[in-house]
Amino acid sequence: MRHYEIVFMVHPDQSEQVPGMIERYTGAITGAEGKIHRLEDWGRRQLAYSINKLHKAHYVLMNVEASQEVIDELETNFRYNDAVIRSMVMRTKHAVTEASPMVKAKDERRERREDFANETSEETEAGDSEE
């Protein structure tokens, strides 16, 4: 079995269908003795350019280990599913399990926001105790 990185973009009006789609695709992979090494739902993001007059899409990234037959089946599903705007399947040399730069940046922003919130709450507590 080979390693693949799969990214697909879903129509923003169909975002509520994404969990079901992920479940269906991961079920097809694991049902054929494949493995899911990384699964990231990036959510709704701005597109770099318009696709079919759309400016946003729901992104999903998967790193999997699967046979060629399963990948062909997934590509066929992407092609005939009207909710999938674009998809890309790339073969990789090895399994990628670490978080993608998109998720790392999101976690970093969350940590900064929490640190800022903690600092401001400490300052307000210090201000309250001085009175």
Curated annotation (Swiss-Prot):
GO terms for biological process: translation. Residues 98-131 are annotated as: Disordered. InterPro entries: Ribosomal_bS6, Ribosomal_bS6_CS, Ribosomal_bS6_sf, Ribosomal_S6_plastid/chlpt, Transl_elong_EF1B/ribsomal_bS6. GO terms for molecular function: small ribosomal subunit rRNA binding; structural constituent of ribosome. Keywords: Ribonucleoprotein, Ribosomal protein, RNA-binding, rRNA-binding. One of its GO terms (cellular component) is cytosolic small ribosomal subunit. Disulfide bonds: none annotated. Pfam families: Ribosomal_S6. Residues 104-116 have a biased composition (Basic and acidic residues). Residues 120-131 have a biased composition (Acidic residues). Belongs to the bacterial ribosomal protein bS6 family. Binds together with bS18 to 16S ribosomal RNA. NCBIfam families: S6. This is Small ribosomal subunit protein bS6.
